[in-house]
């Protein structure tokens, strides 16, 4: 009988001290084994699960993906789609949409699920807001998502840079709706400073992902705090009741149904309007393994459960990600705007956008699987 392949699963947090490790140089990326090897987590072996048939994505033909990548490189911009190895990158890029990642490509955290590189970040690029705004205007985007790495090295966690980007986009593309997907701004006084700064120029949608159930935080999000994230969402909503708030969780990391439902209740109790629920996929063999693949029927049941709690929109499915069809999610939640447009094309209608989503979903079981964080 063939022995099952085994991988490691985090068990508990250990010391952050790594006396044998050389100091990190600013801007140097640590990825895969180098990144997880410095993580304050111990491991135990578990079998590797085979991907089920529903973990599939559509890979469109044509050169739209390369065209968009070229435009991003031309403007020295980064997308989380590329840095986090998102499985939906081909579909989104082929439609001319992307989630821009500001404040560099190096994160100060070492989350065991995430494929973004760890290290000591460089100082924020003061030209980035202008470059981002110019690209958004050139692409004719009507909806844009802006996210960032964690910047625990900055007193405001990067909040001022977010505001600079929002202001620049509104100057160059006043019709564009802006969703920001922020880090947790954890640290003494950092949340207060960040919220004060964001109050000067709030986004159209505020998104912060809790990522997983609280019991798994020590293994999945070392350095983060579940209640802190909930408080950030609630405080922002209290300051800006007219701005929709949003959060997301991944499944397959060892959580139970009861824990997921409790997390959804917590989010709603903290005045979160929209929620995304999707399957975690291991980006490399060095990251947290997948412990379970939730079925499409289970995702559908969670969508119904969430809507019954009072969320204005619940996107729940194996390939759902926080920024995937974010414009559609916001529209369903009542935020009025024209649909996102493709690179160099006229605006698509809401009906056409919905049809594209339906076609992609129907094609999912026939196409190649791409790993994701």
From Swiss-Prot:
Its main location: cytoplasm. It is an enzyme of class 2 (transferase). [4Fe-4S] cluster 2 binds at residues 107, 111, 114. Pathway: Protein modification; protein lipoylation via endogenous pathway; protein N(6)-(lipoyl)lysine from octanoyl-[acyl-carrier-protein]: step 2/2. Residues 360-373 have a biased composition (Polar residues). SMART domains: Elp3 (SM00729). It is found in: Cytoplasm. [4Fe-4S] cluster 1 binds at residues 81, 86, 92, 323. The keyword ATP-binding does not apply. GO terms for cellular component: cytoplasm. Keywords: 4Fe-4S, Cytoplasm, Iron, Iron-sulfur, Metal-binding, S-adenosyl-L-methionine, Transferase. SUPFAM superfamilies: Radical SAM enzymes. Residues 12-36, 346-373 are annotated as: Disordered. Pfam families: LIAS_N, Radical_SAM. Its EC number is 2.8.1.8. Its cofactor is [4Fe-4S] cluster. Binds 2 [4Fe-4S] clusters per subunit. One cluster is coordinated with 3 cysteines and an exchangeable S-adenosyl-L-methionine. GO terms for molecular function: 4 iron, 4 sulfur cluster binding; lipoate synthase activity; metal ion binding. It catalyses: [[Fe-S] cluster scaffold protein carrying a second [4Fe-4S](2+) cluster] + N(6)-octanoyl-L-lysyl-[protein] + 2 oxidized [2Fe-2S]-[ferredoxin] + 2 S-adenosyl-L-methionine + 4 H(+) = [[Fe-S] cluster scaffold protein] + N(6)-[(R)-dihydrolipoyl]-L-lysyl-[protein] + 4 Fe(3+) + 2 hydrogen sulfide + 2 5'-deoxyadenosine + 2 L-methionine + 2 reduced [2Fe-2S]-[ferredoxin]. Residues 93-312 form the Radical SAM core domain. Belongs to the radical SAM superfamily. Lipoyl synthase family. This is Lipoyl synthase. The gene is lipA.
């Amino acid at each position: 009988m063939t022995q099952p392949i085994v991988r490691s699963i985090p068990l508990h947090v250990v010391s952050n001290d790594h006396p044998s490790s050389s100091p990190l140089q600013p801007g140097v990326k640590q990825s895969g084994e180098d990144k997880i090897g410095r993580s304050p987590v111990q491991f135990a072996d578990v079998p590797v699960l085979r991907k089920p048939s529903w973990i599939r994505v559509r890979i469109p033909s044509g050169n739209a993906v390369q065209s968009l990548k070229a435009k991003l490189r031309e403007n020295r911009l980064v997308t989380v789609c590329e840095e986090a190895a998102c499985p939906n990158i081909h579909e989104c890029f082929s439609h001319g949409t992307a989630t821009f990642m500001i404040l560099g490509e190096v994160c100060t955290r070492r989350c065991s699920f995430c494929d973004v590189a760890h290290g000591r970040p460089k100082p924020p690029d003061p030209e980035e807001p202008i470059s981002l705004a110019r690209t958004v205007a050139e692409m004719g985007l009507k909806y844009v998502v802006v996210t960032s790495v964690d910047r625990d090295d900055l007193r405001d966690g990067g909040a001022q840079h977010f505001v600079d980007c929002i202001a620049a986009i509104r100057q160059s593309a006043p019709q564009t709706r802006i969703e920001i997907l922020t880090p947790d701004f954890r640290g003494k006084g950092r949340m207060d400073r960040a919220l004060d700064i964001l109050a000067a120029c709030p986004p159209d949608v505020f998104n912060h992902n809790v990522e997983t159930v609280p019991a798994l935080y020590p293994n999945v999000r070392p350095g983060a705090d579940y209640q802190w994230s909930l408080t950030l969402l609630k405080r922002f909503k209290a300051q800006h009741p007219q701005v929709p708030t949003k959060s997301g969780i991944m499944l397959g990391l060892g959580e139970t149904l009861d824990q997921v439902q409790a997390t959804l209740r917590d989010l709603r109790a903290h005045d979160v309007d929209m929620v995304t629920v999707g399957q975690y996929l291991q980006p490399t063999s060095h990251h947290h393994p997948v412990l379970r693949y939730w079925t499409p029927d289970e995702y559908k049941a969670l969508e119904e459960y969430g809507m019954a709690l009072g969320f204005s929109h619940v996107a729940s499915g194996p390939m759902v990600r926080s920024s995937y069809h974010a414009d559609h999610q916001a529209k369903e939640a009542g935020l009025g705007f024209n649909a996102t447009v493709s690179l160099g094309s006229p605006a698509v209608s809401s009906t056409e956008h919905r049809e594209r989503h339906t076609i992609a979903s129907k094609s999912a079981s026939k196409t190649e699987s791409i790993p994701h964080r």
